[in-house]
Curated annotation (Swiss-Prot):
Protein's recorded name: Snake venom serine protease 2B
Cellular compartments per GO CC: extracellular region; secretory granule
Intrachain S-S bonds: C31-C165, C52-C68, C102-C258, C144-C212, C176-C191, C202-C227
UniProt KW keywords: Disulfide bond, Glycoprotein, Hemostasis impairing toxin, Hydrolase, Protease, Secreted, Serine protease, Signal, Toxin, Zymogen
Propeptide segments, given as residue ranges: 19-24
Active site as annotated: H67 (charge relay system), D112 (charge relay system), S206 (charge relay system)
PROSITE patterns: TRYPSIN_DOM (PS50240), TRYPSIN_HIS (PS00134)
Cell location: Secreted
Job description of the protein: Snake venom serine protease that may act in the hemostasis system of the prey.
Highest classification ranks of the organism: Eukaryota, Metazoa, Chordata, Craniata, Vertebrata
Glycosylated sites: N101, N105, N123, N156
Domain of life, source organism: Eukaryota
Amino acid sequence: MVLIRVLANLLILQLSYAQKSSELVVGGDECNINEHRFLVALYEYTSMTFICGGTLINQEWVLTAAHCDRDTIYIYIGMHDKYVKFDDEQGRHPKEKYIFNCSNNFTKWDKDIMLIKLDYPVNYSEHIAPLSLPSSPPSMGSVCRVMGWGAITPTNETLPDVPHCANINILDHALCRAVFPGLPATSRTLCAGVLQGGTDTCNRDSGGPLICNGQFQGIVFWGWYPCAQPRVPALYTKVFDHLDWIQSIIAGNTDAACPP
């Protein structure tokens, strides 16, 4: 899965346009058909163009990246092959969308997260099940799983019909600060990748999950172009640091207070 990468000067000046909205997993393999029951695919509804991944966290809610937002979205749940439909595959429209917009102790790097309430609940099935929210943040060095229908080549946008999966590592935040000028030391993001290169999220992997020890720890957010370069990790929105907001919105408090 290779994330959309941008030149350093564009990264500094145009954060909102440099995200991995089109990134795919580079260096991975086709996911096992039953290992991504929570992975959803977001399409722009009017053109039915694939735009991003997302993660089902219960029967009514999907968590994805804010930069994946579009005026019209259609969500496929339980999909593996884009062109071969499972009997239990389901489709939903957003009923409500909530984008994190807190300013206290949160910078522009910390806000790429969106909750989508589905127009009606999904039915869990052989290919559909939620992913658990984290009970604690991941530790540095953790081996984590990334997945998506994003680009599988570092430079040419070769998009697969099926999701690809790969293992990457949680890395020292200082490595990402060296790559992404302006990234604060206190950023509520995770730095993850493979230091020797060759494996990464990429274009159109945006919004998909970073899974560590079976828990939903990160959302594909930002990376470099070309993807999968040595010593160039990627950034993932840190789900654990947004838990209070997520749980408040799901509980019906749409005016949820910003986390500390």
